[in-house]
Swiss-Prot record:
Protein name: dCTP deaminase
Pfam families: DCD (PF22769)
Organism lineage: Bacteria, Pseudomonadati, Pseudomonadota, Alphaproteobacteria, Acetobacterales
Function: Catalyzes the deamination of dCTP to dUTP.
Source organism of this protein record: Acidiphilium cryptum (strain JF-5)
Domain of life: Bacteria
Hydrolase recorded as keyword: yes
The protein's annotated pathway: Pyrimidine metabolism; dUMP biosynthesis; dUMP from dCTP (dUTP route): step 1/2
Length: 184
C-alpha cells in the first residue's frame, strides 16, 4: 500500500471533494501548521470540544455511554485538565475513495507537550468530519488551539478496492458532523 503524495491528494481534494475545505499549501506562520504536506494532509481542529469531567462520579462505559461525562466548550482555545481527555472534530469533511485507507498521526508540536491525539483509521468510502480524541498526559493543564493543525492524515492506496467498503456496511459513523460519541 503506497503512501500517496501531495499531487495525488490535491487532485482528489479538488476533483472529487476528498477534503473540504481544502488548504492547498501548508500554513505555518504563527500557527500550528495545517494544510497539504509532502505525503499527507494536516487537518485543523474545530472550535467545539467535549471535555471529560467526573463531577457526577460517572463510570466510562463504551456500551452504555453517558454524555453526562462531558462538559461542552466552544471557543478559540480549549484547556484540557491534567491527566484528562477531550473530544473534538476536524474542520474538514473527508470523503475517502473506495481503494484508500487513511491513517492519522498526532502533530509533533502537541506530542512534545504531552498531548496525544488518537483517531481510528478512515476506512474506504467513509465520509464525515473526523472525531478526534485528545489526551493530556501531563500533570498540568494543556491548551489546544481551534482552527489550527491537530493531526496529520496519511493516504494509503490499496492494490485493489476491497470487496466491502464502510459505505457498503452502512457504518454507524457514516456522514458524521461534529463530535460523535460512542455508538453500538
Amino acid at each position: 500500500m503506497p503512501v500517496m503524495p501531495d499531487h495525488w491528494i490535491r487532485e482528489q481534494a479538488v476533483s472529487n471533494g476528498m477534503i473540504d475545505p481544502f488548504v492547498e499549501t501548508q500554513k505555518r506562520d504563527g500557527v500550528i501548521s495545517y494544510g497539504l504536506s509532502s505525503y499527507g494532509y494536516d487537518a485543523r481542529v474545530a472550535d467545539d470540544f467535549k471535555i471529560f469531567t467526573n463531577v457526577d462520579s460517572a463510570v466510562v462505559d463504551p456500551k452504555n455511554f453517558s454524555s453526562d461525562s462531558f462538559v461542552d466548550r466552544k471557543g478559540p482555545v480549549c484547556i484540557i485538565p491534567p491527566n484528562s481527555f477531550a473530544l473534538a472534530h476536524t474542520v474538514e469533511y473527508f470523503r475517502i475513495p473506495r481503494d484508500v485507507l487513511v491513517i492519522c498521526l498526532g502533530k509533533s508540536t502537541y506530542a512534545r507537550c504531552g498531548i496525544i491525539v488518537n483517531v481510528t483509521p478512515l476506512e474506504p468510502e467513509w465520509e464525515g468530519q473526523v472525531t478526534i480524541e485528545i489526551s493530556n498526559t501531563t500533570p498540568l493543564p494543556a491548551k489546544i488551539y481551534a482552527n489550527e493543525g491537530i493531526c496529520q492524515f496519511l493516504f494509503l492506496q490499496g492494490s485493489a478496492p476491497p470487496e466491502t467498503s464502510y459505505a457498503d456496511k452502512a457504518g454507524k459513523y457514516m456522514r458524521q458532523r461534529g463530535v460523535s460519541l460512542p455508538r453500538l
